């Protein structure tokens, strides 16, 4: 989302909102960046939080951004999860993070995603590595480390690069 810097981000947000698509996990200021998406379906309240890494699979946020995207390691994430847990039936984390082209998640990411569960998340869905990294059940909750490539415009035709995993979630209060 930040490949074209702040102007690209700003333009993307404005265009999505112009056609009625709600954005979350990125923004033009810190309030927008850490604003979750709240959805109600069949009387069930779902809180969605989107986070991203600094880059290159490193579990480190080495900058303090006033705009951009919600940082996966920000201390705000744990507090946001706990806050949503008090007002939502389900809390789902969408994470764009991890080391690209590795079939197993780094131990640091496994630990962080488990922390999200410890803080109250009900489901963690990872993306970014471009390959499937599998799933794990932790404290009765599911963590998907990377769903692979649903679509990626690339000349790479290896099976790992062109394979993705879809998930269907059933939510209940």
Regions found by a protein language model. Give the residues of each.
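Acidic, metal/ion-coordinating pockets
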Residues: 1-173
């Amino acid at each position: 989302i930040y490949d074209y810097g702040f102007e690209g981000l700003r333009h993307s947000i404005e265009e999505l909102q112009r056609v009625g698509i709600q954005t979350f996990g990125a923004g033009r200021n810190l309030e927008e960046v850490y604003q979750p998406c709240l959805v109600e379906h069949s009387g069930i309240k779902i809180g969605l939080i989107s986070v991203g890494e600094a880059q290159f699979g490193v579990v480190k946020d080495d900058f303090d951004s006033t705009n951009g995207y919600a940082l996966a390691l920000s201390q705000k994430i744990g507090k946001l999860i706990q806050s949503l847990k008090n007002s939502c039936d389900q809390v789902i984390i969408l994470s764009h993070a991890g080391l690209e082209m590795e079939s197993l998640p780094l131990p640091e990411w496994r630990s962080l995603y488990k922390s999200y569960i410890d803080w109250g998340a009900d489901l963690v869905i990872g993306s970014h590595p471009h390959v499937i990294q599998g799933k794990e059940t932790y404290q009765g909750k599911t963590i998907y480390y990377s769903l692979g490539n649903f679509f990626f415009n690339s000349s790479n035709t290896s099976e790992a690069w062109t394979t993705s995993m879809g998930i269907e979630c059933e939510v209940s209060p």
